[in-house]
């Protein structure tokens, strides 16, 4: 698709450049706006897929520059990890129809970044600080991400962290009321298996606690701590059982941990104590992370 010119819903012209990578739903390319030097990425997927529709709806809900600026000022922070959203659109190529979304271009995902960092703790603390504020903001809109994993957390050139890929979000607040806990077998193990929360394994709507639990598993990965359930490969049921056992052992203090990693397990213990509808104490979680 390289070289194809596109026009977004705002009438701005873009051109698809080099392929960056492909996933289960589509491909990501570099791109540049024709009217300025703005660099961006363009995600392209078949019109038959619906994940991009979900993502655009999320950005329409949460991406408002003025609202974000007010929220950052209220929280006394200078960064919120939501990528800049430039627009979206659709196009036809040969006999196929496609959707696209235009987003801020970031540098690297945290899975790759942490592979080459010799002393990861300071970076993990910064990533967690950014992500806890980002999730708090998203959760205030009644939305859970549902696919928190190192590949979906990226950094820019200043090592500020961003949460990407809002294709399988859930709305846990509907008409002002929190959804009830309800299991659906068609949604078992939703998300990325190794990082899915227990709620995601059970097929229920992921809520605030599920996102925060998945973020805890990311911390284990970033710190170089093996995920105990990885030995079960893609067996979703066995991974689920292993996570349940792991969390029970964490709560009973039966996990062998180095003192330097105690803060990670304290965080996991805290978020897995939350009830399904409970609003987390994000400030407390930030304090736990600061103790790493």
UniProtKB/Swiss-Prot annotation:
Protein known as: Probable serine/threonine-protein kinase FPV226
Catalytic function, reaction form: L-seryl-[protein] + ATP = O-phospho-L-seryl-[protein] + ADP + H(+); L-threonyl-[protein] + ATP = O-phospho-L-threonyl-[protein] + ADP + H(+)
InterPro entries tied to this protein: CK1_Ser-Thr_kinase (IPR050235), Kinase-like_dom_sf (IPR011009), Prot_kinase_dom (IPR000719), Protein_kinase_ATP_BS (IPR017441), Ser/Thr_kinase_AS (IPR008271)
EC number: 2.7.11.1
Keywords: ATP-binding, Kinase, Nucleotide-binding, Serine/threonine-protein kinase, Transferase
GO MF terms held by the record: ATP binding; protein serine kinase activity; protein serine/threonine kinase activity
Occurrences of domain Protein kinase (ranges): 14-292
Phylogenetic lineage: Viruses, Varidnaviria, Bamfordvirae, Nucleocytoviricota, Pokkesviricetes
Family: Belongs to the protein kinase superfamily. Ser/Thr protein kinase family. Poxviruses subfamily.
Binding site for ATP: 20-28, 43
Species of the source: Fowlpox virus (strain NVSL) (FPV)
Pfam families membership: Pkinase
Active site as annotated: 147 (proton acceptor)
């Amino acid at each position: 698709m390289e070289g194809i010119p596109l026009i977004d819903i705002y009438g701005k012209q873009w051109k698809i450049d080099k392929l960056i990578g492909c996933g289960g739903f589509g491909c990501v390319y570099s791109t540049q706006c024709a009217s300025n030097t703005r660099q961006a990425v363009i995600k392209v997927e078949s019109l038959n897929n619906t994940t991009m529709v979900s993502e655009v709806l999320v950005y329409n809900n949460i991406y408002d520059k003025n609202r974000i600026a007010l929220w950052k000022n209220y929280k006394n922070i200078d960064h919120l990890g939501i990528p800049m959203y430039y627009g979206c659109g659709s196009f036809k190529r040969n006999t196929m129809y496609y959707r696209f979304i235009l987003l801020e271009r970031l540098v690297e995902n945290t899975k790759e970044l942490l592979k080459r960092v010799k002393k990861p703790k300071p970076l993990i603390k910064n990533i967690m600080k950014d992500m806890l504020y980002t999730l708090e903001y998203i959760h205030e809109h009644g939305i859970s991400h549902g696919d928190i994993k190192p590949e979906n957390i990226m950094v820019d050139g200043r090592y500020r962290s961003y949460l990407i890929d809002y294709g399988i979000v859930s709305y846990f607040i509907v008409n002002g009321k929190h959804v009830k806990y309800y299991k659906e077998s068609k949604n078992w193990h939703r998300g990325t298996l190794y990082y899915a929360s227990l709620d995601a394994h059970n097929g229920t709507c992921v809520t605030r606690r599920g996102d925060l639990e998945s973020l805890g598993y990311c911390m284990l990965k970033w710190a170089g701590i093996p995920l105990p359930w990885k030995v079960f490969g893609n067996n979703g049921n066995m991974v689920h059982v292993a996570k349940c056992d792991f969390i029970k052992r964490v709560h009973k203090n039966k996990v062998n941990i180095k003192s330097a990693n105690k803060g990670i397990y304290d965080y996991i213990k805290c978020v897995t104590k939350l009830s399904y509808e409970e609003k987390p104490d994000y400030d407390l979680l930030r304090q736990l992370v600061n103790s790493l």
